[in-house]
């Protein structure tokens, strides 16, 4: 093979490879960026759900907003105040959404309770002084 033909083929393959990588990045970049932006809030939400499941109500109490703490009264009353009336056996995180100014995140969980009933729990978090806190909890029963 001629040296010029080899250079043209290698250059063509390199251009195709670069275009392929750019296409993959263009397709998946929005999801990757969103995952990076929501990760700290999702960690707080996951910790809250784990605390509720494991009965660490004091831990869960520290992750909610001042308004929720004030209305619930104390850590022991938190699940009832939020509408989580049965023990959680398992939960799986579903979707998460972040608002345009990146100060509010909503995280969905699919939950199985001790009596095998299922529900969705939506946690709304707000960024307060660089810390994420839970400002609202919605329990949607199936």
What are these regions (language model features)?
Residues 50, 56-57, 125, 130:
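Preference for short coil/turn "hinge" residues that link or interrupt alpha-helices
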Residues 2, 54, 71-74, 99, ...:
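Detector for Asparagine
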Residues 2-50, 54:
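Short, low-complexity N-terminal intrinsically disordered segments enriched in polar/charged residues
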Residues 97-142:
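Exposed beta-sheet edge and beta->alpha loop/turn motif
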Residues 6, 37, 86, 134-135:
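Poly-acidic low-complexity segments
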Residues 43, 47-50, 57-106, 112-117:
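Short solvent-exposed beta->alpha transition segments
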């Amino acid at each position: 093979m001629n040296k010029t033909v080899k250079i043209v083929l290698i250059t063509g393959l390199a251009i195709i490879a670069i275009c392929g990588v750019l296409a993959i990045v263009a397709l998946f970049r929005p999801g990757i960026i969103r995952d990076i932006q929501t990760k700290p809030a999702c960690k707080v939400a996951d910790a809250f759900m784990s605390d509720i499941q494991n009965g660490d109500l004091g831990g869960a109490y520290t992750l909610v907003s001042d308004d929720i703490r004030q209305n619930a009264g104390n850590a022991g009353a938190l699940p009832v105040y939020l509408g989580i009336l049965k023990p959680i056996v398992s939960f799986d995180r579903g979707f998460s959404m972040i608002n345009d100014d990146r100060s509010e995140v909503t995280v969905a969980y699919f939950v199985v309770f001790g009596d095998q009933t299922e529900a969705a729990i939506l946690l709304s978090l707000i960024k307060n002084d660089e810390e994420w806190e839970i400002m609202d909890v919605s329990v949607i029963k199936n």
